[in-house]
C-alpha cells in the first residue's frame, strides 16, 4: 500500500491526492476546500514530534534522508504521518524522478530496498528539505483532522467512555 501511494500519481491526473487510511471513518461532513489556502495545499506537519528516543521512527527518517540524498536527519524531526494526508501530484512525480536520479535505480527498487519506510516521511522530507514548503505550494498544519489511537497514551481513559460519541 505504501508504494501504491506513489504510483497513484503516475496513473492519475488530479492535481491533489488525498489519502485517508482504511481504518478511519468520517462521522461528520468534511469540506475538502479546508485543505487549500490560496492555491497552497495543506501538509500535515507536526514540528519536533519525532525524537531520538522513538526507535520505530528513526529508520523511517534515516531512509527518507538517504533516499533523497540529504544529510542525516536532525532530531527532533517534524512528523508527516497521519490518517488524512494531502499531497501535490506534481511533487510526487518530481520526488520519484529525484529518487531515480539520486539512486541510479527505478523508484520502486530504490524505495523498497529498505523494508521499513514511511511514504509520508519521504514525501514530507522531499517537499520541505528538497523543495522548501513555500516553494512547493504547501502550508504546514499540525492539527490532526481525525482522532488517532495508535499509541497507548492516545487511548488513555477510553476504558471509562460510556459511548462511541464521547470519543469524538
Roles of regions detected by a PLM:
Residues 30-109:
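Conserved catalytic core of nucleotide-sugar-dependent glycosyltransferases
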Residues 23-27, 31-33, 48-50, 128-130, ...:
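Short, solvent-exposed loop/turn segments at secondary-structure junctions
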Residues 1-3, 23, 116-121:
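Conserved glycosyltransferase catalytic-site signature
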Residues 4-43:
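GT-A fold catalytic core of metal-dependent nucleotide-sugar glycosyltransferases
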Residues 97-168:
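A glycosyltransferase accessory/donor-loop signature
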